[in-house]
Amino acid sequence: MKSLRWRYTRLPSQVEDALSGEEDKEEEEEKEEETTPAPTPVPEHPMVPQLAGASQVLGASEMSQLSLHLPPRVTGYSWSLAFCTSRDGFSLQSLYRQMEGHSGPVLLVLRDQDGQMFGAFSSSALRLSKGFYGTGETFLFSFSPQLKVFKWTGSNSFFVKGDLDSLMMGCGSGRFGLWLDGDLYRGGSHPCATFNNEVLARQEQFCISELEAWVLS
């Protein structure tokens, strides 16, 4: 090889020696470039999910941020507006009716009368139940104004419970991470063991201005 001749042959000047060293270095760099894999490109901005319906609560930025925290299995799913209070009225029973026939996960989002946006992701459709249901994929979130996500701690499995007159998500010491009344007008939020969450609204008790339930499928 040419590089071996340069290494063992006496060169007439230091200039030639320096040049040979530079060429050796260039050959080594070329080999490194051939063997080093190119880094995987990272998207500059999260993708806005495909929507079937228009949200009165979340904008494109909030939806994109939330999509980054959804379980990998729902990546690429479209969001369908199954229920909204402006269209279907302020009624928990109406919400349950709109959930009939759906089995996929649900993103519940709301804005209270203070303008605060928050909600929850449920791994399955919202429904009436005798006890708590759901999986560890369930989480709570709030925009205050930056997005905060409160994932399952593993402390208990009190994910979602649907009664005729209330909907509850997360529980601990008799307090709920998020609960809504039967009229979908009043609600509350407290720290709970399920998600180790902060109070989602500005106050523990709040009044709902707009609520939406998006089915992911």
Swiss-Prot record:
Residues annotated as transmembrane: none
Domain TLDc per the UniProt entry, residue ranges: 56-217
Ranges annotated as biased composition (Acidic residues): 19-35
Single GO cellular component term: nucleus
Pfam families to which the protein is assigned, alphabetical: TLD
Region (Disordered): 1-48
The organism's place on the tree of life at top rank: Eukaryota
GO biological process: response to oxidative stress
Family: Belongs to the OXR1 family.
Protein name, UniProt field: TLD domain-containing protein 2
